[in-house]
């Protein structure tokens, strides 16, 4: 529905009031009703398209009085859709359903299979109702009341079946609405059963009256009773459809449970991955520290002169880590020497590395 600008609506309202100021009272009533209709259409447009603080809104009193005001934040908050409008709410809902649809496609296909079976049963119910209508057409004027009741029952049953089809089509939009839709179907079918019982009761009363007034009504009463039996059979078929609808709802519940289990497993895996990331980070740091310490140790010198000690120091690094090494050595002969060293990283939490070596030359 188109959203009317407030200036256009205001002009329409003033024109409606002013154009017939000198007309009769009945014309004033017509113009007032037309104005109320315009305002109602504007309000309907806001309910569909939404509104925000500062826009013009109209209130219609019980006596038809129209009040114009600027919408406040409180008016937006008090709105059923928080000012978003039915169109935006449906868009958001559709987006949410589309995001969740990939996770439940397999389960929804299973539900759709059950729905197709239910639709077949409902088609059988339609055929049974058609037979009921044909039998009711043959009822005489003495059973007109019975015929009217059964016809009403058949029409209401068809209406309920249409509602069931509409609710089943909504399964593709959101799984969460399955249970509510099927409950509505069950309520409608319960009401249908009650009306069928009332129709049978009325048929029995009409039969008794017909026997007292007309001899040939027996055969037609029997036909009417047969029609009532078919109506009860149709109601039974509808009950079977409701049972299958409940089974589909149970499957939907299983789907939700599976989704919850998957979410819990994903959460556990996420925790394990976080722990693994931490361990990898620690290993990376220790590896870099070790390489830095080895670089420092490799820079230490051994003594050259026979009978001499030496003290040596060196630094080393690898990427962001660095280390300091110190060492000492002693040359026993021209051919034989020994040395030892230790290195420590400069960052906190570093471990020490060391080496001891001998050298023999010939």
UniProtKB/Swiss-Prot annotation:
Region of interest (Coiled stalk domain), residue spans: 170-307
Predominant location of this chain? other
Q: Where do the TM regions start and end? A: 307-317, 321-332, 339-345, 351-362
Q: Which family does it belong to?
A: Belongs to the autotransporter-2 (AT-2) (TC 1.B.40) family.
An individual GO BP term: cell adhesion
Physiological role: Adheres to and induces bacterial uptake by human epithelial cells. Upon expression in engineered Y.enterocolitica confers an 11- to 15-fold increase in bacterial adherence and uptake by human epithelial cell lines; part of the uptake is mediated by integrin beta-1 (ITGB1) suggesting it may be a human receptor for NadA. A bacterial cell surface protein; antisera against this protein induce complement-mediated killing of this and other strains.
Subcellular location per the Swiss-Prot or TrEMBL entry: Cell surface; Cell outer membrane
The set of disulfide-linked cysteines is none
- Biotechnology note: Several alleles exist that vary in length, this is variant 1; alleles 1, 2 and 3 generate cross-bactericidal antibodies, making this protein a good candidate for a serogroup B vaccine molecule. About 50% of hypervirulent serogroup B N.meningitidis encode this protein.
Keywords on this record?
Answer: Cell adhesion, Cell outer membrane, Coiled coil, Membrane, Signal, Transmembrane, Transmembrane beta strand, Transport, Virulence
Induction per the UniProt record: Barely visible in early log phase, levels increase to a maximum in stationary phase cells (at protein level). Transcription is repressed by NadR (FarR).
The protein's assembly and partners: Forms high molecular weight oligomers in whole cell extracts that are not disrupted by boiling in SDS buffer. Homotrimer. A fragment containing the N-terminal half of the mature protein (residues 24-210, head domain plus part of the stalk) binds human integrin beta-1 (ITGB1). It was not seen to bind immobilized purified CEACAMs 1, 3, 5, 6 or 8 nor commercially prepared type I collagen, fibronectin or matrigel.
Report the protein name in the record.
Answer: Neisseria adhesin A
Classification via SUPFAM superfamilies: Pili subunits, Tropomyosin
Entry's Gene3D superfamilies?
Answer: GSPII I/J protein-like, Methyl-accepting chemotaxis protein
The UniProt gene name for this protein comes to nadA
Question: Which lineage is the organism of this entry classified under, starting from the top rank?
Answer: Bacteria, Pseudomonadati, Pseudomonadota, Betaproteobacteria, Neisseriales
Question: Which N-terminal stretch is annotated as signal sequence?
Answer: 1-23
Superkingdom, natural source: Bacteria
Question: Which residue stretches, if any, does this entry annotate as coiled coil?
Answer: 90-146, 183-288
What remark about domains does the record contain? The signal peptide, cleaved at the inner membrane, guides the autotransporter protein to the periplasmic space. Insertion of the C-terminal translocator domain in the outer membrane forms a hydrophilic pore for the translocation of the passenger domain to the bacterial cell surface. The trimeric head domain (about residues 24-169) is highly antigenic, it sits at the end of a coiled-coil stalk (about residues 170-307).
GO CC annotations on file = cell outer membrane; cell surface
Q: What segment(s) does the record annotate as region Head domain? A: 24-169
